Regions:
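C-terminal edge beta-strand
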Residues: 18-25, 88-96, 161-167, 236-241
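A short beta-strand segment in extracellular, disulfide-stabilized domains
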Residues: 42-50, 111-120, 184-192
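Surface-exposed, flexible coil segments in extracellular/virion-facing regions
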Residues: 51-70, 127-140, 202-215
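Solvent-exposed segments in extracellular or luminal domains encompassing
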Residues: 1-7, 64-77, 138-148, 214-223
Length: 241
């Protein structure tokens, strides 16, 4: 029945009549607000309107606006009562989306790569500084220069995770390994702190050896690769011909 006023008449068996005026009040236009979407761990504010007295379910009560932090998708219902005692309800759904979690190494050398992964598929990767490191669509991080970079993995819901990666500089070698006569030596130098164990190595010690301070001693004709590794595990090479 729609809101308004009417008169109800009662007539008894003797033809006697009595009239009663009745007013029908409309229901309050209660609103719980629009449905909302949040990421796991976030809060959202619910604001109801449309009635003199408002009360939420789920243990919220008369608090309005109300801040809630659901751990899973939840429907909240608000009950509104107007000044005439008429009652109406409305609902709002708060969808809780899962936040991805990145895993993988936190260190990479310049010109080196590491692969990061997420526990949820379907997101996109991004680097906040391509001058320090780039990241591919599959999570492969390539070091560019020394520094720290934040790698972010974002879902279509907007939920994301950020992972900090440190890029270490690649050592720079100095010295000449071409045309060294047998019986002579050449000392290579490198930038950075040497690794604590075997910082200098030769790929073929029958051709040339190298000691812990970078002194290369040729032994026979041929080619070998001299490698220096720094304390961060980053390495550079030079060829002895």
């Amino acid at each position: 029945v729609s809101a308004g006023s009417t008169v109800v008449r009662y007539t008894d068996g003797n033809g006697c009549e009595v009239d009663q005026s009745i007013t029908v009040h409309g229901l309050p236009n209660v609103s719980a607000g629009s449905d909302q979407s949040i990421c796991s761990g976030e809060s959202v504010t619910l604001t109801a309107s449309g009635a003199a007295t408002l009360s939420w379910d789920n243990g919220i009560g008369a608090t309005n606006p109300a801040t809630v932090s659901p751990t899973s998708t939840t429907t909240y219902e608000v009950t509104g009562t107007d000044g005439d005692g008429c009652v109406n309800t409305d609902q709002v759904i708060v969808t809780v989306n899962t936040v991805p979690s990145i895993s993988g190494s936190t260190e990479v050398c310049a010109e080196g790569t590491i692969t990061l992964s997420s526990d949820i598929t379907g997101g996109t990767w991004d680097s906040d500084d391509d001058g320090v490191a780039t990241v591919s669509a599959s999570g492969v991080v390539t070091g560019v220069s020394a520094g720290t970079v934040d790698i972010t993995y974002t879902m279509s819901t907007g939920c994301d995770d950020t992972y900090s990666v440190t890029v270490y500089a690649k050592p720079v070698l100095s010295g000449t390994l071409t045309g060294i006569a047998n019986g002579s030596t050449e000392t290579l130098t490198a930038t950075g702190t040497p690794a604590s164990s075997n910082p200098w190595t030769s790929s073929n010690t029958a051709i040339a050896t190298v000691n812990s301070t970078g002194v290369v001693t040729p032994l026979s004709t041929g080619t070998t690769t001299i490698t220096f590794t720094n304390s961060n595990g980053c390495s550079s090479t030079a060829s002895f011909v």
